[in-house]
């Protein structure tokens, strides 16, 4: 799709007789530029053009002619100034929600549901009318429409601020670019709508089948793959993933009549009339008994739905009652999610095989007849180690019971002994590495795990380490996936992960993966080199994670990076100094110290340093040290912070993120399900903050938070 020809500017001017004011010209240019960009998006990202190339060329020529006649209209991001699909990339900038995007409280038993309904009845003095809808196991998305046109799509984030994923949202089939009002439901000037993005089970299975056919590892489950697909930097990848969306709520509305709906059910009718997707399985019911019937029904028919569900959401339907009931800092009081228990199924254990991980750990896994469970097909499950296999008492050939804990992770519970026919056989852990032949042994006496000690050259450990370097929790290098790791090692382009940051175009041309049929470097190869260059500036904690030091994940790495500030300082620290860091302890400290005693480990660090990888963090002077000297304990789940993020925020402001409550504790921050630390704080009289109080404490220090 390209055009360089121009039209006679006089012809353009002749068409502007009724629209020649400056504002009119700007409006005309904006409408035409938007239309061109829309068709470019359909062509380059969605691969689904709706006009011919000739029609597009004519449209682009009209825009070029308009800009030539009125150069002041031309902007740097005009379609005439960009090549092809340039500009269609998602950079995940912060996007503030117009209205807070709350979470939901969960209940897991009929008694807990009844207690919630009783609180509602006590508050309103009667049985409420409820709206029951399926709880889709997907990822939340907020859309903003202004004057009927899609303006922005954003993830939930911390409820106040999410990530801008507008380009990716536009690729979802169910997300309309433009809404159409009706006589019954006129469009508000601004509409913020919330929904769930998901994979239909059939689409998820097709996606995984395609990945397996390409020699790539399949996704674990539909929810995680939906979240990953929505967060792709290249929206064209998202477009190929066949994501779907269902709307289940409203945020901010700007309308002459205020919030124009009496019930949530009416709001859903309006959304559907405007062209937005809503669930066909929503039901209005009155009283707890009717709610319980809906929950029981969908518990039995959950696999009759095209997508995965993990419960039923129950909402008070009348908007006036919703406002009366209000919300906590994290969830509305007028809604609750009834979560179904994890599912179990029986299947045949065909074999037990082993996998060698990046730190040499040899893990047995169950290879089973595929079985449907929790809406997806399961054929593999971990067995952790040889001792666990013996403890569970499973034999190869057994019929076994498997469960998806939390409807996500497959787990072998044990055998159905009564179904044994004598053909079953015991699994024996290998004595030598299946990849390199080295004799296996525990890292130390008493360990349940056995490991391959050939950490430097074992092919399995090498490719897992190279792949790990690129992971989201490490350097986060797009383009360096499992297939790329194998290709680079097999072509001997790299000997280990230490060579990654000195890769050149000539190096990549030695692999088929990054070479075109014409013998040139592929687009993926160029992208990999660019992303490797960017990764050199990643913060220190990511470098630590990428080194594959045993026990050092993002939590410990952040703690060490925050405490010491540079890799040299970490190497120079004693084991006791490392262990004293909050969140580290003696086991991790010993692992870090031991790792740096190995010559080839230090060589990897030296190679990265020589290639320009950042080995020290610059302290952010813009963050005020509002918590200097304060010991703060975080307990329970926070909506806006992961546990690591909360600790990082405390440490960055000069505080200590303590793991236990004592008389020296300045504050305890209590989220959802806080546990014994909350009780200890009450017993000792330590001030307790909710999440809003914690946020004020971070911003202003100890003088202003309210518990």
Curated annotation (Swiss-Prot):
Binding site for Zn(2+): 433, 436, 452, 458
Keywords, comma-separated and alphabetical: DNA damage, DNA repair, DNA replication, Ligase, Magnesium, Manganese, Metal-binding, NAD, Zinc
UniProt-annotated stretches for the region Disordered: 1-23
Presence of keyword Zinc-finger: no
Active site residues of this protein: 135 (n6-amp-lysine intermediate)
Protein name listed in UniProt: DNA ligase
Protein encoded by which gene: ligA
Cofactor(s) needed for function: Mg(2+); Mn(2+)
GO molecular function: DNA ligase (NAD+) activity; metal ion binding
Function text: DNA ligase that catalyzes the formation of phosphodiester linkages between 5'-phosphoryl and 3'-hydroxyl groups in double-stranded DNA using NAD as a coenzyme and as the energy source for the reaction. It is essential for DNA replication and repair of damaged DNA.
Stated family: Belongs to the NAD-dependent DNA ligase family. LigA subfamily.
């Amino acid at each position: 799709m390209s055009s360089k020809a121009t039209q006679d500017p006089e012809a353009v001017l002749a068409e502007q007789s009724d629209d020649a004011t400056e504002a009119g010209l700007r409006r005309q240019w904006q409408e035409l530029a938007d239309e061109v960009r829309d068709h470019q998006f359909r062509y380059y990202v969605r691969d689904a053009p709706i006009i011919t190339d000739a029609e597009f060329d004519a449209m682009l020529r009209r825009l070029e002619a308009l800009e030539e006649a009125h150069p002041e209209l031309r902007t740097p991001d005009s379609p005439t100034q960009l090549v092809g699909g340039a500009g269609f990339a998602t950079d995940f900038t912060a996007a503030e929600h117009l209205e807070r995007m709350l979470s939901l409280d969960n209940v897991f038993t009929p008694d807990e549901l009844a207690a919630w309904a009783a609180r509602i009845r006590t508050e309103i003095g009667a049985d409420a009318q409820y709206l029951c809808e399926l709880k889709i196991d997907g990822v939340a998305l907020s859309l903003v429409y202004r004057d009927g046109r899609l303006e922005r799509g954003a993830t939930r984030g911390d409820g106040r601020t999410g990530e801008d994923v507008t380009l990716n949202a536009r690729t979802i089939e169910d997300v309309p670019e433009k809404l159409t009002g009706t006589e019954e439901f006129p469009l508000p000037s601004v509409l913020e709508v919330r929904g769930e993005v998901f994979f239909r089970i059939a689409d998820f299975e097709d996606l995984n089948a395609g990945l397996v056919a390409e020699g790539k590892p399949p996704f674990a489950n539909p929810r995680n793959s939906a979240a990953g697909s929505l967060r792709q930097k290249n929206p064209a990848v998202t477009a190929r993933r066949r994501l779907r969306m269902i709307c289940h709520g409203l945020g901010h509305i700007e309308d002459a009549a205020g919030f124009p709906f009496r019930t949530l059910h009416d709001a859903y009718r309006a959304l559907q009339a405007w062209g937005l997707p809503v669930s066909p399985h929503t039901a209005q019911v009155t009283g707890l008994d009717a709610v319980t019937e809906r929950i029981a029904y969908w518990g039995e028919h959950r696999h009759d739905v095209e997508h995965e569900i993990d419960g039923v959401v129950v909402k008070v339907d009348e908007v006036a009652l919703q406002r009366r009931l209000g919300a906590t800092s994290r969830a509305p009081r007028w809604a609750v999610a009834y979560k179904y228990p994890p599912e179990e199924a029986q299947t045949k254990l065909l074999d037990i095989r082993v996998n060698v991980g990046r730190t040499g750990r040899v893990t047995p896994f169950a290879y089973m007849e595929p079985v449907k469970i929790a809406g997806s097909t399961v054929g593999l499950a971990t067995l952790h180690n040889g001792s666990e296999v013996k403890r569970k008492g499973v034999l190869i050939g057994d019929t076994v019971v498997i469960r998806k804990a939390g409807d996500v992770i497959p787990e072998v519970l044990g055998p159905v002994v009564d179904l044994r026919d004598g053909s079953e056989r015991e699994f024996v852990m290998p004595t030598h590495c299946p990849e390199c032949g080295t004799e296996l042994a525990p890292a130390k006496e008493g360990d349940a795990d056995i490991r391959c000690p050939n950490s430097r050259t074992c092919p399995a450990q090498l490719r897992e380490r190279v792949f790990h370097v690129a992971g989201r929790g490490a350097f986060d290098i797009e383009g360096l996936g499992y297939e790329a790791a194998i290709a680079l090692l097999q072509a001997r382009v790299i000997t280990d992960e230490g060579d990654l940051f000195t890769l050149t175009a000539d190096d990549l041309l030695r692999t088929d993966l990054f070479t075109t049929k014409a013998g040139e470097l592929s687009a993926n190869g160029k992208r990999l080199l660019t992303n490797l260059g960017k990764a050199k500036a990643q913060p220190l904690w990511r470098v630590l994670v990428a080194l594959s030091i045993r026990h050092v994940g993002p939590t410990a790495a952040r703690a060490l990076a925050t405490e010491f500030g540079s890799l040299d300082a970490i190497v120079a620290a004693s084991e006791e100094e490392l262990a004293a860091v909050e969140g580290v302890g003696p086991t991790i400290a010993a692992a870090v110290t031991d790792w740096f005693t190995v010559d080839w480990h230090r060589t990897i660090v030296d190679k990265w340093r020589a290639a320009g990888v950042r080995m020290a963090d610059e302290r952010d002077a813009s963050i005020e040290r509002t918590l200097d000297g304060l010991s703060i304990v975080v307990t329970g789940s926070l909506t806006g912070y992961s546990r690591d993020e909360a600790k990082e925020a405390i440490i960055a402001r000069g505080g200590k993120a303590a793991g236990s409550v004592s008389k020296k504790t300045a504050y305890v921050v209590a989220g959802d399900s806080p546990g014994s630390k909350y009780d200890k704080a009450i017993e000792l009289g330590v001030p307790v903050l909710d999440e809003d109080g914690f946020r004020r404490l971070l911003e202003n220090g100890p003088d202003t938070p309210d518990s």
